[in-house]
A protein has these predicted regions:
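Structural marker of alpha-solenoid helical repeat scaffolds
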Residues: 457, 491, 525-526, 559, ...
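Terminal, low-structured helical/coil segments at or just beyond the last alpha-helical repeat
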Residues: 611, 637-641, 645-678
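Residue-level recognition of tetratricopeptide repeat
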Residues: 428, 470, 504, 538, ...
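Helix-start (N-cap) detector for alpha-helical repeat units in TPR-like alpha-solenoids
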Residues: 462-463, 496-497, 530-531, 564-565, ...
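Structural signature of tandem alpha-helical TPR/SEL1-like repeats
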Residues: 440-449, 475-487, 508-521, 542-555, ...
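Primarily the internal scaffold of c-type cytochrome electron-transfer domains
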Residues: 25-31, 38, 53-128, 136-141, ...
């Protein structure tokens, strides 16, 4: 064998040995018996029976205090010296108070004379957040869990709008979706076809099994006095410290790796992750490719740590290297953190200019892991988990208004980076990003291209077809949207959302026979979606099934009494189809109590005032509608009628001219204007 062949052989051998060390065989990873899907969860009380000391310590941590009934919360908020919070974008004031032992949040509006013209109250049923940094409050109505608009920010000791509300104020109606609840609480009985419906009561905080996996097998083995130990490992329950590097990281990353958007693998949801498996087998987490170097979110610990040279140069640095999850972080001594750094960075061997700050009693974290505001949560002081050299750290300014979107961003899968990206998952991510974050059409164009090409190669992708339908629908291509939804249903005949979207498309296209049947199929698969019931009411009404439409609107309201649109729609049916003026008026008032800026309810109230010859209120409601949309033609029509009846003919002419300018084909306005000129 010549030297060249020997060199190639040796090189190849070294490569194989290297691969054996860097890519461990998955079959060598210990298998924990509680990974089996048949093993059930038992709850923290079972754990506490044997592990009382650990349990009593854990319930004092941020995770152990992540979600709890509002009545059980130790008062740390200031309910007396709290000035109202004003949302100038929407002209609402907010205030939190204690009323008969309940935490109540109030929304109100005042007019130019200082008179209160709107008020809405909601009781906080649960607190979300440990109080280490903030407390946010949620209310539960018929199982629908919704966020309240004010948060107590502990670091600044102040009330302010809840995270995200400075940009988009969803008032009392922001849904707490499953993925959000999953990382703030233990395992819930969530209704999968809903957006935010849970079977109550809800658990009280993140529990032991979130990090250790389901405990039934472990508990039963102890009851049966079975010795499952092999060496130091009990394979009936996961202890994260015995997991391989990536699986150990993933236990924490299930919640501490936020990203921009997550997309679940086919047939997976949050609860399918169990400690001991890889997180990427359950979901893909997408990041912004070109994000600002030192901008971080409140749940970006893993992402930021992964950018650290300490992490990149180590095969053993994980979250629990520095954190004991059973002990409140405030009880970790500064020395304990320093010792972890000194295990690799002995001061004697450091080549540094600043010797004074690199003694054994120095504070490594203070200099190398700076604290500051986050990009998504206002008024907090949080530790950046990217370990850096102080001289190169450049803090990014943080706005309480959250991110200001300009040009579209590029998303990249955290786990795969740009290597072999899953185009279907990425396409879904762009559609969801458009719907939830940034309404820029380029996301939809990119998603359609990705999904079309990938689905031609692998068409058995239910979520891929559904989101392709959504992308087409959102771009106005209703024909291709319908085709994609039918592909979705071909693969999942019980896909309630696809049937609901087919109903919406049929309504838009005035296919009045098809629309009701599509909504019925959706309701048959899942009967608790108020939006589908409301749309079903539309379809029935347009098909002249008035009584059935009335029942559908009523069902929507019974499911969600906060559903302003359903009140308005039922009111219109009662007023215009059944001449039930009083009942219609009550529904419009209920709508306006929930949404004082509901332009159609305001218009309907002005019409009722006209019927009752109450010209003053007819004018008032019409003018109020025009403050919301100055081009709202129906309100000008009401004003023209009011002015004409009052003999204010010049004003009537001006308003009619405005109508014609906005709607050149409005023959009625032209006819009335011509008659007034004569």
């Amino acid at each position: 064998m010549n030297k060249q062949h020997l060199f190639i052989l040796l090189t190849f051998t070294v490569m194989i040995v290297g691969l054996l060390f860097t890519q461990p065989n998955r079959s060598t990873i210990p298998y924990y018996k509680n990974l089996d899907s048949s093993v059930q969860y038992v709850g923290d009380e079972e754990c506490a029976a044997c592990h009382a000391d650990i349990y009593n310590s854990f319930i004092r941590t941020g995770m152990g205090r992540s979600f709890y009934p509002a009545g059980n919360a130790e008062a740390i908020e200031d309910f007396k010296n709290n000035a109202p919070i004003y949302d100038a974008n929407n002209n609402f004031y907010y205030k939190t108070s204690l009323q008969e032992g309940n935490i109540v949040q109030t929304e109100y509006r005042i007019n130019a004379a200082g008179e209160k013209i709107h008020e809405l109250n909601r009781r906080a049923d649960y607190v979300m957040g440990s109080g280490n940094h903030n407390r946010t409050y949620v209310t539960v109505q018929n199982g629908f869990v919704k966020e309240l608009p004010l948060t107590w920010y502990v670091d600044k000791k102040k009330w302010d709008l809840s995270p995200g509300y400075h940009t988009t104020n969803m008032r009392f109606f922001r849904p707490i979706v499953e993925e959000c609840m999953h990382c703030h609480n233990s395992f819930t009985d969530f209704e999968p076809n809903s957006q935010n419906k849970y079977n109550t009561p809800l658990p009280h905080g993140i529990g032991c099994e979130r990090c250790h996996g389901p405990g039934r097998l472990h508990v039963q083995s102890r009851i049966d006095n079975k010795n499952e130990l092999k060496g130091n490992i009990d394979y009936t329950i996961v202890n994260p410290k015995h997991l391989p590097f990536q699986e150990q990281l993933d236990v924490c990353q299930q919640c501490h790796l936020q990203g921009e958007i997550s997309v679940f693998q086919p047939d997976k949801r949050s609860t399918d992750f169990r400690p001991g498996i890889q997180l990427r087998s359950v979901k893909s987490i997408f990041m912004e490719k070109n994000q600002k170097p030192n901008e971080f979110r409140i749940a970006s610990h893993a992402e930021r740590l992964a950018k650290s040279m300490c992490f990149q140069g180590s095969s053993s640095l994980t979250c629990i290297t520095c954190h004991n999850p059973h002990v409140p972080v405030q009880e970790h001594s500064r020395r304990s953190f320093n010792d972890n750094c000194l295990a690799c960075h002995d001061p004697k061997t450091l080549i540094v200019e600043d010797i004074e700050n690199h003694k054994k009693d120095s504070d490594c974290v203070k200099c190398h892991m700076t604290q500051g505001g986050t990009a998504d949560i206002p008024h907090v002081n949080f530790t950046d988990h990217k370990i850096q050299i102080p001289k190169i750290i450049q803090k990014t300014a943080v706005s309480i208004s959250g991110r200001i979107y300009n040009a579209p961003i590029e998303l990249v899968n955290f786990f795969t980076k740009e290597k072999s990206p899953n185009a279907i998952q990425t396409g879904i991510a762009y559609v969801r990003y458009f719907e939830s974050r940034h309404q820029h059409k380029d996301y939809l164009i990119k998603a359609i291209a990705m999904l079309k090409e990938s689905l031609q190669k692998n068409d058995h992708q239910i979520a891929g077809w559904y989101h392709l339908g959504r992308a087409y629908q959102l771009t106005g291509d209703l024909k291709n949207a319908e085709s994609a939804y039918y592909q979705t249903i071909a693969q999942d005949p019980n896909h309630t959302l696809a049937f609901a979207q087919l109903g919406v498309l049929a309504l838009a296209d005035e296919r009045l026979r098809q629309a009701p049947s599509s909504f019925r199929r959706s309701i048959n698969n899942y009967p608790y979606n108020p939006v589908v019931w409301n749309n079903y009411g539309h379809a029935l009404l347009f098909s002249d099934s008035t009584n059935a439409a009335l029942a559908a609107y009523t069902m929507a309201i019974s499911l969600d009494p906060d559903y302003a649109n359903a009140f308005n729609n039922r009111g219109e049916l009662l007023l215009y189809k059944q001449s039930e003026v009083s009942k219609g008026k009550n529904d419009f008032l209920s709508c306006l109590a929930l949404d004082p800026d509901h332009i159609f309810a305001l218009h309907n109230m002005s019409n009722i005032a006209l019927l009752e010859e109450d010209l003053e209120n007819a004018e008032r409601f019409a003018l109020q509608a025009l403050t919301i949309n100055s081009d709202f033609v129906p309100a000008y029509g009401t004003l023209a009628t009011v002015f004409q009846r009052q003999g204010r003919l010049d004003e009537a002419k001006r308003v009619l001219s405005r109508i014609i300018k906005l709607d050149k084909n409005n023959a009625d306005a032209r006819k009335i204007l011509d008659s007034l000129r004569d």
